[in-house]
Amino acid sequence: MTVRHWVALDACRKAPNAGAALVLLQRMSADTGLEGLARALRREWPDSAAVSWTLLGNVSGEMLAPWLTQPGEDIWISPDGTARRATLGPLLTPSPLPASQAGLWLVTGGARGVTAACAIELARQSGGTFILAGRSAETPWPTGIRETTDLKTLRGLMASSAVRHGEKPSPAEIDKAARTAIAGLEIRSTLAQIKATGADARYLPMDTSDAGSVTAALAHIRQRYGAISGLVHGAGVLADRLVEEKTEAELRRVFATKAEGLFHILSNIDRAALRHVGLFSSASAFFGNRGQSDYAMANAILANAGRALHAELPGTQVKVFDWGPWEGGMVDATLARHFKEKGVPLIPLGEGARIFAHELLAGDPSDVELIVGTVWSNT
């Protein structure tokens, strides 16, 4: 999957972007996401026409020909030659929560940040047991140093402590130790907040980009806790760079965590036991965003994987959340200013978490893909 999408991106980079007309052709499957690339290209190359055509079966060349003269937009083409635009469901007021939703939940990327807030709210509304999985180690807080989540402050405290003890760590070593300590502190805080709701919570180191790590972690969960009934895939990384500058290594890193990671999990669990699946996608996959061609493709794959799961598991609530930018998420100060200038407000942490939990537990089952946040126009 990753190689296939890199080949497409690399081919686009070699096309003249001034006035170019690019049609990205793909067959509908759970592991394809070229529509994300087309949408990112339209943001980065406004003078070009980049579209994706997704074939919903065996479509002949004769059936495709008439669409070459149509206005450029992303479409799904059926074997009879008819086409429709890619659409998603509206965010509606969900129905009341069922009486009990307790089960065994696996949450990737769920011990820190935005996904942690969603996991806490989900625990509050559902109960059950939560296994939070992430790459960070649950490192104990260093002895003799006061707790703080401010990285700059902690680096200073650690440097002063090292001097008192006659140690001479490098700035890079201090930074790494500080980040590791804060990660451990945040993990323990999330576990405590989930337990405060009455649910149970455990942390398990697991790197979704590493198939071996996922296999071992899920075997442990299966042996100790049983079958997973709820999956929340929130793990993800960014490597923002314009298409012309994008490297294969960056794309691989983004795909490994977000897209490949999901399939590593799905191939190691009993999918028939799933009752809820919540996938953290991004509005950049639906609207495109400058510098995020790889991230848009990886998240578009999540949307298609969600549709495939919805078809495979008709009794399972499957939701793909195309999130806009969050307060306290991966949006730094510079990017926050960019969105503000474009009229795209950040999603408040508490409000976003409540939307997530209520939609996943009680939203309309027919609405698989949802945009949460303001519609992007010219971002």
Predicted regions and their residues:
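NAD(P)H/NAD(P)+-dependent Rossmann-fold oxidoreductase cores
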Residues: 1-13, 17, 57, 61-281, ...
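Hydrophobic anchor at the start of a short beta-strand
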Residues: 20-22, 48-50, 130, 201, ...
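C-terminal low-complexity, glycine/proline- and small-hydrophobic-enriched intrinsically disordered tails
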Residues: 21-22, 134, 358
